[in-house]
Curated annotation (Swiss-Prot):
Complex and partners: Component of the cytochrome c oxidase (complex IV, CIV), a multisubunit enzyme composed of 14 subunits. The complex is composed of a catalytic core of 3 subunits MT-CO1, MT-CO2 and MT-CO3, encoded in the mitochondrial DNA, and 11 supernumerary subunits COX4I, COX5A, COX5B, COX6A, COX6B, COX6C, COX7A, COX7B, COX7C, COX8 and NDUFA4, which are encoded in the nuclear genome.
Protein name: Cytochrome c oxidase subunit 4 isoform 1, mitochondrial
Keywords: Acetylation, Membrane, Mitochondrion, Mitochondrion inner membrane, Phosphoprotein, Transit peptide
Keyword Phosphoprotein belongs to the record: yes
Protein family (similarity comment): Belongs to the cytochrome c oxidase IV family.
Modified residues (N6-acetyllysine): K29, K53, K60, K67
Gene Ontology cellular-component terms listed: mitochondrial inner membrane; respiratory chain complex IV
Chief location of this protein within or outside the cell: mitochondrion
Organism of this sequence: Sus scrofa (Pig)
Pfam families: COX4
Length: 97
């Protein structure tokens, strides 16, 4: 009877200690919902932020060309500028899966 109590106590401590050790290193990172986020939704057509946040050198050059006349831009450059702001077009969003 005494041995059963001792093993019971040791077993409980071992379990609770191992649970504490496992839970100690895990940090849960919560998302800050105060900051605007990008969403692709038909009912929310203009998101608060652009799809691409960190621009490459070629993307920055295209953004500089955007400040000039749009008639001087090719169709591919216009599509590239669109893709910087949006991930999907309305046609792509409306496409059935």
């Amino acid at each position: 009877m005494l041995a059963t109590r001792v093993f019971n106590l040791i077993g409980r401590r071992a379990i609770s200690t191992s649970v504490c050790v496992r839970a100690h290193g895990s940090x849960v990172k919560s998302e800050d919902y105060a900051l605007p986020v990008y969403v692709d939704r038909r009912d929310y057509p203009l998101p608060d932020v652009a799809h691409v946040k960190n621009l490459s050198a070629s993307q920055k050059a295209x953004k500089e060309k955007e400040k000039a006349s749009w008639s001087s831009l090719s169709m591919d450059e216009k599509v590239e500028l669109y893709r910087l702001k949006f991930n999907e077009s309305f046609a792509e969003m409306n496409r059935s899966t």
